[in-house]
A protein has these predicted regions:
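Phosphate-end processing signature that detects enzymes handling 5′-triphosphorylated RNA
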Residues: 1-248
Length: 248
């Protein structure tokens, strides 16, 4: 177990410390909030806790075009999807209490395959926690740091909204796949120059993600399927914006 923990931690540090491209496969399983207690109990019984970051609150600021092209890619079921986001975590990873560690991420998805590039960006903590999404620094981060990732992006991207959720991480003992259970998914701040605030958005949905592994090779997933959890495509950003726009 010690060898496994050390090896896994090494990979996570490489992903977290700078620019890195991660080609991988990802499958999602979706359920309702009232199934959360069963799912988390089953994961704790059958899986290993993530040895590096077992739990966090994840905040993701999504960039989109004035025509919400990224949102429409997701809701339209496009086979090829691109998303750009600025992500941060609680507890924070920065040793400096005045700063927050964020990651500018560009993620391309083709079917179930995905490639994610990201770079670490340190920002002022107080500013990030309180700034309106029309603040020019959000665009400056994108203009300054995205080119170093060597990725093509749609023109006219601007901050759209912050999706926030609780993430609990596990390792499948059979395949060493990374397993994430996301719950309490909702939309926080929005850019009111792009979207109208029509009320709070809280999805009554849980999402189980299987990363770097084929679901057919994971025997314990059948128990979740029997409980009503279903494999399907799901975008937290897409679902939150659809709920905001009353299109869900």
């Amino acid at each position: 177990m010690r060898v496994f923990n050390n090896a896994f931690a090494s990979v996570m540090e490489r992903v977290g410390d700078g620019e890195f491209q991660v080609p991988s496969a990802e499958s999602k399983f979706v359920g309702t909030a009232d199934q959360e207690e069963f799912v988390i109990s089953w994961l704790r019984h059958i899986c290993l806790p993530d040895p590096v970051h077992p739990e966090a609150i994840v905040s993701s600021l999504y960039y989109d075009t004035p025509g919400l092209n990224s949102y429409h890619e997701k809701t339209g079921g496009d086979f090829i999807k691109t998303k750009c986001r600025l992500r941060w975590y609680d507890p924070d990873l920065s040793a400096d209490t005045a700063l927050r560690t964020t990651y500018l991420e560009i993620k391309h998805k083709i079917g179930q395959g995905r490639r994610k590039s990201r770079i670490r960006v340190a920002v002022d903590r107080g500013w990030l926690d309180t700034a309106g999404l029309d603040h020019p620094e959000f665009h400056a981060i994108l203009a300054r740091d995205a080119p170093s990732l060597g990725e093509s992006l749609p023109s006219g991207l601007m901050p759209a909204g912050v999706v926030r959720y609780r993430r609990r991480r596990f390792i499948c003992p059979f395949t060493l796949s990374r397993i994430c259970l996301d719950s309490d998914i909702g939309l926080g701040r929005i850019n009111e120059r792009l979207l109208s605030r029509l009320g709070p958005v809280a999805l009554g949905t849980i999402v189980l993600e299987v990363k770097d592994g084929a679901p057919a090779q994971i025997p314990w997933l059948s128990r979740l399927y029997a409980a009503g959890i279903r494999q399907r495509s799901f975008s937290k950003y897409g679902a939150c914006i659809a709920s905001l726009l009353k299109e869900a």
